[in-house]
């Protein structure tokens, strides 16, 4: 080892699979033919690395996982030979398999070596048979009996073989008889090497403490005279050794802690020391040239040592083959204006394939059927491919028509749009029409064919979009209950079923809402988002909702992306395993978010956490470590099942499986600090306290266990759990009733709140998730009757308990179960509304340094909103994704997915008081997602306005802006605006109609079938111009101006109501609008203000900006569509004291007597 030797490269050992964790290499070896370093792992995979940079070259699964780890790699001119406990495998250096040999007597192979015949190798191990294998033919040519268990082999003058008792046998290279034997070490030989006439060994011996430790001596033997030589002292413990390939008496000796020693065997005093930067060394190897040294450590890394100027693996290496470089096509000057005839066509003399005659087209075999994704977890490797149990989704002798379309029509046909129903309303008698939803969910096909279809309500549901957008879709077709469903067409919306389940667990719901009402403003707080979602679902009262903000927060977690929990990763894993992984992530993140505000986690632990301790005991030295083993989600562990005894054997009852899963005991390989190596360890959990909410992952990975669930009544509605001195007792059925009568101490009875199931109907191919929930548990009414509901995204319907808990259908599989303590039934806590932390409304919050905002004046404590306080609201949005439109062959267009918008600006104005009309919120929202269009001419948002580095506005995260609106909502404020339904949907907040005043519906004439734009209403009522055509694309709407105009229109409408002239005013507005096309006329310098029919007041115009008017959707469609939108019916409108008209003063910017002074007074 020269003076400039040092570590040149360090690489991690590649994981066994794309999503697996790295594991330490079990063996490493330098190739003696090419510049390659090879490594094997415990999963049977061998990987090669090229050159000093250790670039990955090939990676091959040489042995099945069931065969065990790769224990040795041997090289031949024709290829690379690897050995595992049960097989021998040979590949080319490019990774192509040459042969694979396994034998019934190959049970524990450890080592192999070349023999005197270079085309044969001998393999041996801790077994009574050795095998001679012909490398050229790939067959076993001889089987030899042996009385020794061999663990290492090295070829030199003799075949040196180490036994598992610490001896070394010198075997003849011809007949493999034992020529000489030495007792080299006390217990075992860890490593050895033989070259020319010398053999060096390292091993373990038992000292006075009784446990084996590394010997401080490396033993040396002369193979020429078959006699021992003086050993090499190595006080750090000689664990590994390699002989130098060129210097016959020089060897490398290494310790487990990384100390390297280069020593001359003939002169032990001449040594050279180095220290490798490793925590625990697992092996070394030296290259055939002697210029490189590889080190394998326990931290899953490979280190390469050598001289930077001289390093090479072989003296004469064969050139390593690499894939041919694909030639790049010549660049083309391609633009939208490039004519196609400039591209040109290649010259040809033969007939083109496109001219293939039709009479030569024949149908051959059908394409193979796609692999059922539900079988992936059950696949087992075989010699040829994999096999799995037959799911029996088709009848006997029935095959799949693979020539049919890959996507089947959904069983539940989408309803007609609301606009279509409105047009057809006059064609049919109302008595003859029956509720579409009742027909569909009762089993009648929507095409009129009365045919029972019990799978109808389990079908995939999809939202269809007309030219009027999502508002034209009839969600009530799918849900006529008071419980709201969740929409699809949102990234990661496959979690809808899990979110519904968590919402209906009262203790989880209370936890989320109390946290949302706290001081938390962390941008990525998942618990806050759950609180907002749960509040929205309750306020919606059966109207469809969407989890946009929560799923956006979920999508922002890098940990979730690394775990493959997002929708784009579902192609590689089953939906069932994905939602169970999401469940674990949600619970862990909830606990993390809760502790961010409340460091003491007693409340959380009492509700969700199983308090336990985990003991880890080494099976070799009996050393035991105890550590906390708390868990938020428990996975069911199933025993080995004989299905014939499943009904009679008590061990197969749900309660017993639950008990074994909670206090699980497993055996695994783990690191033992006392033994300083990986050993077999036993892991056992001791339970100290059970939570009030018990969430279980079904973990169905075995079709045999699936049959347990198909037993009627196997899943109980109630289970009892008692913890006594760390032991868990579970009861169900009559046994639970007996224990309740006996008043067993510490017994907690849990009732089933609901479960998430995977639905995989073969006819529809696309699996999805639904939830079955007992909604009575979270009801505020103390009703004793249980009512089960199916939540299939936005399809919600009541089902029988037996249907919810029945799993004897192959298309329905359980995923997640949720139990809650029966004492917490109806424990719905709304006290969070009384402890809302509203300090956010009274202080400035900014991401970009708290820049001064002249457009707003923050609320004071005296202006604290109270129920009924009016506030004017307007928002602006930018486009994050454009709409996805399908253009059909006839030229018609269908919206497949609407555009996705992001909230960019929120303006909220005072609606009453001295500072009426003055903004107290004017926030720009920073957006981390790519923005495809700022729509500046409509939104007024310019590039750079939402960037904290360049923005001149008050920037806040979406969480802060949303929480301000949520606080105003729950304080009882009344929101005044124009077109609020669209704004609320994009903001993702649910505002009850009683807290909404929308001027779009106030100024609506029932007989005119048209909604008026804010721009036209401003001119018609006040003769003012707003939203005028911008001079350039850098101008647009001003949300403060729009909100103030909506507030003024509402105030003026109240005056019309007080005077009793609403109908006359509306007639005049629509009469004038029909003449002008419902657009303000061009400016002429002077206009008249409409005060009452036939009366006019002259005033000067004010400036403003312009956007297109609301389009005339025409017909009865508009009238029908308005019934589902938030509105304020004039007949039912009751004005509180806070909603009284203005006193004629206005203290905001641009003051004027616009809020009063009406001639009507």
From Swiss-Prot:
Spell out the residue ranges making up region: Linker.
316-452
Q: What class of enzyme is it?
A: hydrolase
**SMART domains xrefs:** EXOIII
Any idea what this protein is called? PAN2-PAN3 deadenylation complex catalytic subunit pan2
Q: What sequence ranges are listed for the domain Exonuclease?
A: 871-1049
Coiled-coil stretches are none
CDD domains listed in its UniProt record: PAN2_exo
Task: Provide the binding site for a divalent metal cation.
Answer: 874, 876, 983, 1042
> Spans of biased composition, class Low complexity?
1116-1129
Swiss-Prot/TrEMBL domain comment: Contains a pseudo-UCH domain. This ubiquitin C-terminal hydrolase (UCH)-like or ubiquitin specific protease (USP)-like domain is predicted to be catalytically inactive because it lacks the active site catalytic triad characteristic of thiol proteases, with residues at the equivalent structural positions that are incompatible with catalysis, and it cannot bind ubiquitin. It functions as a structural scaffold for intra- and intermolecular interactions in the complex. The linker, or PAN3 interaction domain (PID), between the WD40 repeats and the pseudo-UCH domain mediates interaction with pan3.
Instruction: Indicate the segments forming the USP domain, all copies.
Output: 453-822
SUPFAM superfamilies on file = Cysteine proteinases, Ribonuclease H-like, WD40 repeat-like
Q: What is its EC number?
A: 3.1.13.4
What is the annotated localization of this protein?
A: Cytoplasm
Cellular component annotations (GO), alphabetically ordered: P-body; PAN complex
Residues of the region (Disordered) are 1092-1161
Major localization class: cytoplasm
The scientific name of the source species is Neosartorya fischeri (strain ATCC 1020 / DSM 3700 / CBS 544.65 / FGSC A1164 / JCM 1740 / NRRL 181 / WB 181)
Q: Which residues form the signal peptide?
A: none
GO molecular function annotation: metal ion binding; nucleic acid binding; poly(A)-specific ribonuclease activity
Could you list this entry's UniProt keywords, alphabetically sorted.
Answer: Cytoplasm, Exonuclease, Hydrolase, Metal-binding, mRNA processing, Nuclease, Repeat, WD repeat
The UniProt subunit note reads as follows:
Forms a heterotrimer with an asymmetric homodimer of the regulatory subunit pan3 to form the poly(A)-nuclease (PAN) deadenylation complex.
């Amino acid at each position: 080892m020269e003076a400039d030797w040092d570590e040149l490269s360090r690489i991690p050992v590649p994981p066994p699979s794309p999503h697996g964790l790295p594991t330490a290499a079990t063996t490493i070896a330098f190739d003696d033919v090419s510049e390659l370093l090879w490594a094997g792992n415990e999963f049977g995979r061998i990987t090669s690395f090229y050159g000093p940079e250790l670039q990955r070259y090939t990676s091959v699964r040489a042995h099945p996982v069931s065969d065990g780890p790769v224990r040795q790699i041997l090289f031949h001119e024709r290829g690379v030979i690897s050995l595992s406990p049960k097989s021998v495998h040979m590949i080319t250096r490019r990774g192509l398999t040459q042969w694979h040999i396994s034998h019934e007597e190959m049970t524990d192979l450890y080592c192999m070596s070349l023999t005197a015949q270079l085309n044969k190798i001998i393999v041996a191990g801790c077994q009574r048979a050795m095998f001679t294998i012909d490398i050229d033919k790939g067959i076993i040519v001889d089987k030899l009996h042996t009385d020794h268990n061999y663990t290492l082999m090295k070829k030199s003058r003799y075949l040196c073989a180490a036994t598992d008792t610490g001896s070394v046998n010198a075997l003849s290279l011809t007949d493999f008889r034992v020529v000489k034997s030495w007792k080299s070490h006390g217990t075992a030989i860890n490593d050895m090497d033989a070259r020319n006439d010398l053999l060096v060994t390292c091993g373990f011996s038992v000292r006075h403490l009784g446990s084996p430790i590394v010997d401080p001596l490396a033993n040396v033997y002369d193979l020429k005279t078959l006699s021992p030589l003086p050993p090499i002292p190595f006080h750090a413990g000689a664990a590994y050794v390699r002989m130098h390939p060129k210097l016959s008496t020089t060897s490398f000796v290494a310790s487990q802690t990384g100390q390297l020693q280069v020593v001359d065997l003939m002169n032990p005093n001449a040594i050279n020391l180095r220290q490798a930067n490793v925590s625990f060394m697992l092996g070394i190897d030296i290259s055939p040239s002697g210029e490189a040294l590889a080190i394998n450590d326990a931290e899953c890394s490979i280190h390469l040592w050598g001289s930077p100027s001289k390093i090479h693996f072989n003296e004469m290496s064969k050139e390593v083959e690499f894939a041919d470089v694909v030639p790049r096509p010549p660049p083309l000057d391609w633009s939208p204006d490039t004519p196609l005839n400039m591209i040109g066509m290649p010259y040809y003399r033969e007939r083109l394939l496109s001219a293939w005659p039709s009479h030569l087209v024949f149908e051959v075999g059908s394409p193979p059927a796609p692999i059922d994704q539900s079988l992936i977890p059950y696949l087992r490797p075989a010699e040829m491919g994999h096999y799995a149990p037959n799911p029996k989704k088709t009848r006997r002798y029935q095959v799949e028509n693979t020539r049919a379309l890959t996507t089947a029509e959904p069983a539940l046909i989408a309803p007609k749009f609301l606009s279509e129903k409105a047009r057809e309303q006059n064609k049919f008698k109302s008595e003859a029409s029956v509720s579409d939803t009742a027909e569909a969910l009762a089993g009648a096909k929507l095409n009129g064919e009365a045919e029972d279809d019990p799978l109808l309500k389990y079908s995939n549901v999809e939202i269809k979009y007309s030219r009027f957008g999502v508002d034209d879709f009839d969600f009530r077709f799918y849900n006529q209950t008071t419980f709201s469903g969740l929409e699809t067409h949102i990234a990661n919306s496959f979690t809808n079923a899990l979110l519904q389940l968590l919402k209906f667990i009262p203790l989880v719901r209370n936890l989320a809402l109390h946290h949302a009402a706290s001081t938390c403003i962390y941008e990525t707080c998942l618990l806050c988002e759950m609180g907002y979602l749960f509040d929205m679902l309750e306020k919606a009262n059966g109207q469809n909702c969407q989890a946009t903000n929560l799923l956006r927060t979920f999508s922002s977690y890098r940990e979730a992306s690394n775990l493959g929990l997002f929708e784009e990763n579902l192609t590689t894993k089953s939906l069932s395993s994905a939602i169970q992984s999401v469940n674990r992530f949600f619970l862990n993140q909830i606990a993390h978010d809760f502790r961010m505000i409340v460091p003491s986690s007693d409340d959380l632990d009492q509700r969700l956490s199983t308090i336990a301790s985990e003991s880890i005991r080494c099976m070799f030295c009996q050393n035991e470590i105890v550590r906390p083993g708390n868990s938020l989600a428990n996975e069911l562990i199933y025993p080995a099942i004989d299905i014939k005894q499943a009904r009679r054997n008590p061990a197969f009852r749900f309660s017993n499986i639950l008990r074994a899963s909670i206090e699980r005991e497993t055996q695994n390989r783990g690191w033992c600090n006392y033994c300083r190596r990986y050993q077999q360890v036993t892991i056992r959990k001791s339970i100290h306290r059970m939570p009030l909410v018990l969430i279980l992952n079904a973990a169905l990975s075995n079709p045999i266990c699936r049959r347990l669930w198909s037993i009627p009544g196997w899943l109980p509605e109630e289970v009892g759990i008692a913890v006594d001195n760390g032991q868990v007792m579970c009861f169900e059925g009559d046994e639970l009733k007996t224990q309740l009568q006996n008043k067993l101490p510490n017994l907690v009875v849990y009732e089933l709140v609901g479960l998430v199931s995977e639905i995989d109907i073969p006819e529809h191919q696309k699996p999805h998730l639904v939830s079955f929930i007992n909604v009575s548990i979270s009801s505020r009414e103390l009703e004793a009757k249980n009512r089960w509901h199916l939540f299939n995204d936005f399809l919600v319907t009541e089902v029988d308990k037996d249907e919810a808990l029945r799993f004897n259908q192959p298309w329905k599989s359980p995923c997640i179960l949720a139990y809650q303590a029966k004492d917490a039934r109806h424990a719905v806590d709304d006290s969070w509304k009384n402890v809302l932390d509203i300090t956010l409304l009274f202080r400035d919050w900014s991401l970009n340094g708290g820049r001064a905002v002249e457009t707003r004046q923050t609320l004071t404590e005296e202006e604290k909103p109270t129920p009924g306080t009016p506030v004017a609201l307007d928002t602006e949005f930018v486009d994050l994704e454009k709409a996805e439109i399908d253009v059909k062959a006839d030229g018609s267009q269908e919206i497949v997915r609407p555009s996705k918008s992001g909230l960019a600006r929120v303006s909220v104005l005072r609606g009453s008081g001295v500072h009426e009309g003055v903004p107290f919120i004017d926030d720009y929202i920073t957006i981390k997602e790519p923005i495809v269009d700022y729509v500046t001419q409509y939104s007024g948002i310019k590039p750079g306005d939402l960037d904290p580095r360049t923005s001149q506005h008050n920037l806040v995260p979406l969480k802060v802006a949303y929480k301000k609106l949520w606080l105003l909502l729950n304080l009882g404020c009344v929101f005044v605006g124009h077109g609020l339904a669209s704004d609320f949907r994009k903001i993702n907040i649910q505002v009850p109609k009683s807290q909404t005043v929308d001027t779009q519906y106030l100024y609506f004439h029932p007989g005119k079938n048209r909604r008026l734009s804010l721009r036209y209403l401003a001119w018609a009522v006040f003769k003012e111009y707003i939203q005028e055509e911008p001079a350039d694309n850098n101008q647009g709407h001003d949300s403060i101006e729009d909100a103030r105009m909506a507030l003024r229109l509402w105030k003026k409408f109240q005056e019309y109501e007080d005077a009793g002239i609403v109908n006359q005013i509306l007639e005049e507005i629509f009469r004038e609008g029909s003449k002008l096309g419902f657009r303000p006329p061009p400016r002429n310098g002077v206009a008249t203000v409409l005060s009452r029919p036939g009366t006019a007041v002259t005033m000067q115009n004010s400036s403003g900006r312009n956007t297109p008017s609301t389009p005339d959707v025409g017909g009865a469609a508009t009238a029908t569509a308005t019934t589902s939108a938030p509105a304020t019916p004039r007949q039912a409108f009751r004005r509180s004291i806070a909603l009284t008209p203005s006193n004629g003063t206005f203290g905001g910017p641009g003051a004027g007597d616009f809020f009063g002074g009406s001639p009507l007074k």
